[in-house]
Amino acid sequence: MNVAGGGTGTTAGSAGNNNTLPMAQLADGWLELESDPGLFTLLLEDFGCHDVQVEEVYDLQKPIESPYGFIFLFRWIEERRARRKIVETTAEIFVKDEEAISSIFFAQQVVPNSCATHALLSVLLNCNENNLQLGETLSRLKAHTKGMSPENKGLAIGNTPELACAHNSHAMPQARRRLERTGAGVASCRFTGEAFHFVSFVPINGQLFELDGLKPYPMNHGCWEEHEDWTDKFRRVMAERLGIATGEQDIRFNLMAVVPDRRIAITHKLKMLRTNQAIVSGTLQKLLKADEQGERDEQQRPDTPNTLLEPSAFTARDLQSLLKNLDTEIAINEQHLADENDRRQMFKVDASRRTHNYDKFICTFLTMLAHQGVLGELVSQHLLPSKKISGQSAANRLNKQNSAAASTANSSAGATAGGAKSQQQQQQQQQPQQPQTPKNGKSPGKTPGRRRKGRNKCRKRK
């Protein structure tokens, strides 16, 4: 979730809901806020404007019912090429007439990190008071800054303690620590290299205005056509703006709409449906009684040409069907109202989680783990997974190398042993065989057959 606002000023005191903080601690001590519609809705309630809510817009082509204005959050990079294109385009539509500027609420952002509040005020304080109840704080600010220059209006916003306290009460603890770490002397988002910034788009006197507290003048995008709504003109401007901004594939932006509180419209519709339900139910009861009475009178009264009954506009069956439809509509709207109330409650739960400081809990928890002797093991298991994986990989590679070396050694040893054995067999085959000594110890003589053959030869000679 993007955080709006750039640099910081001097350290701010505890914001909360305490409106008695010293002015010296509020003027330059505004904190960064997230671009969350729930946060903005609760911030409007803290300003005293209870009939408004903020919704995030995901589809530009989807119609939005009765918006007061739009808030556009985009990435602010002064040196970016796309940024220069936007500046060159918008320089032609600056409104420099002092009388025209003083007739609208346009305030320059002179307090760092206050662009979220500036964007909301640019929408609310340019709306018709007959359609919107601003509350005491905003009504007083609007009356007090009437006719002021844009710079003085920005100073008036920064010097309003109710606004500063409400703004800072929705900041995360990290924003306060960042403010304390940087301190004064750091440039605001007007001069930072990269930050996220809010601007407002509102209809004023039949023309679409873009109000940016970091610009010297408001921007007039002109009138919309007679047959279209001002939101159609806004869609065309945003489509062109996003086409320029995303030229370098930078799509980090979001869009929010400031709309009437949906619960008010749902409650009004429920009241109307219940009134119609009571009317239809009463009419149905009267019709049923009239039918019963008519049947009894018909039985008692003689038929004459002068006794004519007016035909009813609705039959009992028609009224029963209408009553059933009303019951269904009431159930649907009651569910919508319950969903909106649950959503508003979740905004408060998320705000409590966002602004709560978990530092003490985390420190105490880690201290208890250290006393129990399990902190080191948890760190080695969860915080150093890459080292463990790399160590296991090295061990696996070493085991594979050892296995390969062992298999190579075994194969070479087997080959050496086989060669020696074959050489020994060859030597044994080349050596003459020694006669075997018999068991009785006597050397073997000639075979009896040879001796007999020799004797026969001698006898023949004689």
UniProtKB/Swiss-Prot annotation:
Q: Which residues form the ULD domain?
A: 357-385
The UniProt entry's GO CC annotations, sorted and at most eight, read: chromatin; cytoplasm; PR-DUB complex
Is the Protease keyword given for this protein? yes
Residues the UniProt record annotates as site (Important for enzyme activity):
D212
Residue spans with biased composition (Basic residues)?
Answer: 448-462
Region annotated Positively charged C-terminal tail required for binding nucleosomes, chain positions: 387-462
**What range(s) does the UCH catalytic domain occupy?**
29-260
CDD domains hit by this protein: Peptidase_C12_UCH37_BAP1
Question: What is the top EC class of this enzyme, as a single word?
Answer: hydrolase
Q: What is its EC number?
A: 3.4.19.12
Q: Which residues does the UniProt site feature Transition state stabilizer point to?
A: Q109
Query: Where in the sequence does UniProt note compositional bias of the Low complexity kind?
Result: 399-447
Which terms are listed as keywords in the entry?
Chromatin regulator, Hydrolase, Nucleus, Protease, Thiol protease, Ubl conjugation pathway
What residue intervals traverse the membrane?
none
Could you tell me the Gene Ontology terms of the biological process aspect for this record?
epigenetic regulation of gene expression; heterochromatin formation; protein deubiquitination; specification of segmental identity, abdomen; ubiquitin-dependent protein catabolic process
What's the catalysed reaction? Thiol-dependent hydrolysis of ester, thioester, amide, peptide and isopeptide bonds formed by the C-terminal Gly of ubiquitin (a 76-residue protein attached to proteins as an intracellular targeting signal)
Subcellular location as annotated: Nucleus
Gene3D superfamilies, from UniProt? 1.20.58.860, Peptidase C12, ubiquitin carboxyl-terminal hydrolase
List the catalytic residues: C115 (nucleophile), H197 (proton donor)
Predominant location: nucleus
Q: Name one GO molecular function term.
A: chromatin binding
Region annotation Disordered: where it falls in the sequence: 394-462
| Cross-referenced PANTHER family | UBIQUITIN CARBOXYL-TERMINAL HYDROLASE, UBIQUITIN CARBOXYL-TERMINAL HYDROLASE BAP1
State its role: Catalytic component of the polycomb repressive deubiquitinase (PR-DUB) complex, a complex that specifically mediates deubiquitination of histone H2A monoubiquitinated at 'Lys-119' (H2AK118ub1). Mediates bisymmetric organization of the PR-DUB complex and is involved in association with nucleosomes to mediate deubiquitination. Does not deubiquitinate monoubiquitinated histone H2B. Required to maintain the transcriptionally repressive state of homeotic genes throughout development. The PR-DUB complex has weak or no activity toward 'Lys-48'- and 'Lys-63'-linked polyubiquitin chains.
The subunit field of the Swiss-Prot or TrEMBL record says: Catalytic component of the polycomb repressive deubiquitinase (PR-DUB) complex, at least composed of caly/calypso, Asx and sba (MBD5/6 homolog). The PR-DUB complex associates with nucleosomes to mediate deubiquitination of histone H2AK118ub1 substrates; the association requires the positively charged C-terminal tail of caly, probably due to direct binding of DNA. Interacts (via ULD domain) with Asx (via DEUBAD domain); the interaction produces a stable heterodimer with a composite binding site for ubiquitin.
Protein name, as recorded? Ubiquitin carboxyl-terminal hydrolase calypso
Please tell me the species this chain comes from: Drosophila virilis (Fruit fly)
